[in-house]
Amino acid sequence: MNPLITDFQTPQQRTPVIVALDFANEKDTLGFVRNLDPALCQIKIGKELFTATGRSLAESLIHQGFKLFLDLKYHDIPHTVAQACKVAADMGVWMVDMHASGGRRMMEAAAEAVAGYGTKPLLIGVTVLTSMEQSDLAEIGLNTAPEEQVIRLAKLAQSSGLDGVVCSAQEAAPLRRELGRDFVLVTPGIRLDVAGNNDDQRRIMTPAEALAAGSTYLVMGRPVTRAADPVAVLREVNRVANLEAN
């Protein structure tokens, strides 16, 4: 049975998908989300869309009832990251991330900055980008396997007060064993069918595989946003998630 984060979702209503809104502008984004139900998914805004639209779009989506993952991958001095997390909390952001390689002091400052909020955003550490393989790590001076580096950074994130990490589905099972059932695992690189995949997410799995491995949330972009019926895709993944939970 897949571990559940019971503080955030009940087994009967598990909705693990975070839809990556990888659109270039506000018009296309709002046109797409108009047909989504906040009860079926969470949504994510990344660097491109946030840079193009600023906080106004993010706040609009939050006001529509969506749980928003602000995926800006903070990596800066502790004070700067802490202040950014406070701004995100003031906006009502549900989840925000930062590079765990920014170190303990940066992550502890972020956790302390939002500790006083009644409803604080989940703080998530970015470990190893899913586009990176062992050869990529070697090029930046890390002579270790991706899984080893992920576990090292995830342990650091947990001990620094973060709520979870971003990891590929391949790392989910060992992380779940190492860090326990309450640590949030956010998994990108999710595809409905891995056969013939040639995009930039190297370490990929299907929703069922990722959930079985221990992932808490599944980041899905094109498989949802380019689907003929995005709602049908979300309902099917939710169905699989609740079967896995039971």
From Swiss-Prot:
| Alphabetized InterPro entries for the sequence | Aldolase_TIM, OMPdecase, OMPdecase_AS, OMPdecase_bac, OMPdeCOase_dom, RibuloseP-bd_barrel
The answer to whether UniProt assigns keyword Lyase to this entry is yes
Give the E.C. number(s). Answer: 4.1.1.23
- Residues that bind substrate, according to the entry? 22, 44, 71-80, 130, 191, 201, 221-222
Recorded hits in Pfam families, A to Z, give: OMPdecase
Name a single GO biological process. 'de novo' UMP biosynthetic process
Database matches in SUPFAM superfamilies: Ribulose-phoshate binding barrel
Catalytic residues of the enzyme: K73 (proton donor)
Q: In which pathway does it act?
A: Pyrimidine metabolism; UMP biosynthesis via de novo pathway; UMP from orotate: step 2/2
Gene Ontology terms: cellular component = cytosol
Instruction: Note the PROSITE patterns from the entry.
Output: OMPDECASE
Q: List the disulfide bonds.
A: none
Q: Describe the reaction catalysed, as an equation.
A: orotidine 5'-phosphate + H(+) = UMP + CO2
Class of the enzyme per the UniProt entry, highest EC level: lyase
Q: Which UniProt keywords apply?
A: Decarboxylase, Lyase, Pyrimidine biosynthesis
The terms under GO molecular function for this entry are:
orotidine-5'-phosphate decarboxylase activity
HAMAP family cross-referenced by the UniProt entry = OMPdecase_type1_B (MF_01200_B)
Q: Which family does it belong to?
A: Belongs to the OMP decarboxylase family. Type 1 subfamily.
> Subunit structure, per the record?
Homodimer.
| Summary of the function given for this chain in its UniProt record | Catalyzes the decarboxylation of orotidine 5'-monophosphate (OMP) to uridine 5'-monophosphate (UMP).
Protein known as? Orotidine 5'-phosphate decarboxylase
Q: Which organism is it from?
A: Neisseria gonorrhoeae (strain ATCC 700825 / FA 1090)
